[in-house]
Amino acid sequence: DFMAIVLYSDYESIGTVETGSELVNKLISNIEWGMKGNFLDVPTDCPQRDERMGWTGDTQVFSATASYLADTYAFYRKYLYDLYQEQLLAGGMVPEIVPTFGPTKCSCAWGDAACIIPWNVYLFSGDKTILENQIESMKAWVDYIRRIDGDHHGWRQVFHYGDWLALDRTGAAAKQRVWSD
């Protein structure tokens, strides 16, 4: 026998979904526990690996789901403050990881966290203060892109992750394995 203690940032659960499907309910439970496993001071990218870094792209993609499941206002307010502090040091660029640990780069979607996360938190909370607090960060990100883009479309010429986890076509056998009991 063993006991585990789950460490995560304090937040109040406010939403969930229950269906008539045991498999879908298990998926929802896994999402809720995955969020707990990834919300410890900063939103980390994946609970199954040792990396545990605050990838901005991952958290911006999950921010609406997180805000549906929990009151994320205080958690994201703190994270967005940290993001802006890193952004100030990088001349408006939003690092791909916050907090950063040395030299970093940015990418579309990852840097867009500066605009998408506050917007999602606002949509779910109705509190415009998050937008007021982050407007300088949002503007700095857009200004950074404009500055890099310049007259020669430089933004298109720098590194971007793109859709690095695109789903490829799968055959009937793979689909059957996924959906069978």
Question: What is the meaning of each model-derived region?
Answer:
Residues 3-30, 36-37, 43-95, 105, ...:
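Active-site acid/base region of carbohydrate-active enzymes
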